[in-house]
Design a protein with these regions (language model features):
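Ligand-binding loop in jelly-roll beta-barrel domains
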Residues: 70, 87, 98-127
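A short, N-terminal "cap"/entry segment at the start of jelly-roll beta-barrel domains
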Residues: 1-48, 130-137
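Residue-level recognition of well-ordered beta-strand positions that form the cores
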Residues: 55, 80, 117-118
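Glycine- and acidic-residue-biased ligand/ion/polar-headgroup-sensing regions
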Residues: 58, 68-83
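Short, surface-exposed loop and linker segments with low hydrophobicity and enrichment for Pro/Ser/Thr
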Residues: 1, 61-72, 110
């Protein structure tokens, strides 16, 4: 079995990671902090960049929240729910830009599971003072 993200230190830049379906099934689901009926598995993490799975049980919701400084991509892998006012099911893709409120509502009878990426917005360096050119008045 491949090492878990915790065993890998959750920072594996430059390393190939192969996790089989058997390995993935053996990884424990962890409670998603602050959300009853929701669990997750972190598959890879480097700093604040995260790739993982989230599962929300039937009849539960993941309340509205906002990632102010991150891009959030999701691919529904099982079940259905409503996101951003649209019913989504297996195979649906959702992109939520930084700062946009979203929730997981109306979870179907089989719950919903999705693969997600969470990627913080990159902030470039401040302009170099030597490169700032004053324009003549």
């Amino acid at each position: 079995m491949s090492p878990s993200p915790v065993e890998r230190g959750r920072d594996d830049l430059g390393r190939v990671i192969v996790t089989t379906s058997t390995d993935l099934a053996a990884m424990p689901w962890e409670d998603l902090r602050g959300v009853d009926g929701a669990t997750h598995k972190v598959l890879w993490q480097s700093g604040d960049n995260v790739i993982g799975l989230i599962r929300v049980e039937a009849g539960r919701t993941k309340p509205e929240h906002t990632h102010h400084g991150a891009h959030h991509h999701m691919l529904i892998t099982r079940g259905s729910c409503v996101m951003l006012g649209t019913r989504v099911e297996e195979g649906s893709y959702i992109y939520v830009p930084p700062g946009v409120a979203h929730a997981v509502d109306d979870v179907g009878p089989d719950g919903v599971e999705f693969f997600y990426t969470y990627r913080p917005v990159e902030v470039g360096p401040a302009p170099d003072d030597d490169l700032v050119v004053a324009h003549p008045v």
